[in-house]
Amino acid sequence: MVVEADKKALICSFCSKKQHEVKKLIAGPAVFICDECIDLCTDIMKEENKVALKQITSSIPTPQKICGILNDYVVGQDQAKKILAVAVYNHYKRLEYVQSGNNDVELNKSNILLIGPTGSGKTLLAQTLAKILDVPFTMADATSLTEAGYVGEDVENILLRLLIASEFNIAKAQKGIIYIDEVDKIARKSENPSITRDVSGEGVQQALLKIMEGTVASVPPQGGRKHPQQDFVQLDTSNILFICGGAFMGIDSIITSRTNHSSIGFAANVNIDKEKNNSEILKSLEIEDLTKFGLIPEFIGRLPIVTTLDELDKEALITILTKPKNAIVKQYQKQFELDDAELVIDYSALETIAEKALAKKTGARGLRSILEHLLLDSMYKVAELKKQRVTITKEVVNGLVEPIMTSLISTKSNKKQPIITDIPA
């Protein structure tokens, strides 16, 4: 057997330096990289991180400006808006401080927990914040998550969605916002430790702890379970802001039980208001109530900022229908305009729509489905007829009559009518 004496010299695949010209030469599948190129790549990544952070932090509005923009889209919830505005502002100022290299005071991350009834604006608040700050944003449903190794979705898939939202720009993804909805559904099934594994409750809380606190997570770019041989993307979650939301149905009973128990005997308040609504009860929320509900103390500790949202009343729902920039009625009016038609809604009809949404206990979320049902036939017809004015009255909402359609051509005045009529003074 003849051994080749003059073997080909190993060189860096990037800078072409030979092995003896560098300190280290690291081998990969058919490629090599030297220590100098690794240092250069590290410097480039650090510089890109600084640029990405500077773009975000240089454009951070003040808390008052954030609140002002939120007011354009979200009706009511003033206290929640204020808390969120301050929390988000401080979060991104913290990133700027950390990136500057200062370490005289260690600033910890403050994730947020939103508690409020269905349709009160939790998701919309998170979405609007991401839009204001122009950062990558993704939403996840906690009910689909399970502990690793069980049927369901791994928590790392949440990070994958954020990467996709940032177009796999790791530096941008590491400064993004993740909203986890229905977090109350991963509450522990029982206060007492169970001998059976709670893979969709406490198990998910445990799995979320690390990524919420801050860790370098291995994210599978093609999803975790179908492609086990893929290369992982390393994502640092230390600067990702986590916002969790949930309705926490039944926590009002826990709060009431605690407050009533603490007011027995001579210290009892005889003027206890038995007519308190859920919003007022939630204002008395304590950490122990969340623990009693089923969140483990470690998980609650990762969510230091807790705010509650009010239940929307009829007036708030009417405002949601008509006032915000993305108001539902405005959206439908624009749809009709695209077909050379007009949509006019009586104020009494809006009141009835709001009452129906309240009866269904779906909050603002139910408004669109009610309007969609009311306007379906009209939208079907105006696309063909054109130049039509569609009027929705209280009787139409109650199903007593069909929407009133009149031709704009035949009317004496072609002048555009206001979107809402008979508004009370």
Swiss-Prot record:
Protein name: ATP-dependent Clp protease ATP-binding subunit ClpX
Domain of life: Bacteria
GO MF, any single term: ATP hydrolysis activity
Keywords of this entry: ATP-binding, Chaperone, Metal-binding, Nucleotide-binding, Zinc
A GO-annotated cellular component: HslUV protease complex
Matches recorded under InterPro entries: AAA+_ATPase, ATP-dep_Clp_protease_ClpX, ATPase_AAA_core, Clp_ATPase_C, Clp_protease_ATP-bd_su_ClpX, ClpX_bact, P-loop_NTPase, Znf_CppX_C4
Domain (ClpX-type ZB): residue spans on this chain: 1-53
Organism: Rickettsia conorii (strain ATCC VR-613 / Malish 7)
Protein's gene: clpX
Residues the entry annotates as binding Zn(2+): 12, 15, 34, 37
Pfam family for this entry, one: ClpB_D2-small
Keyword Nucleus: no
Matching PROSITE patterns: CLPX_ZB
Residues binding ATP, per UniProt: 117-124
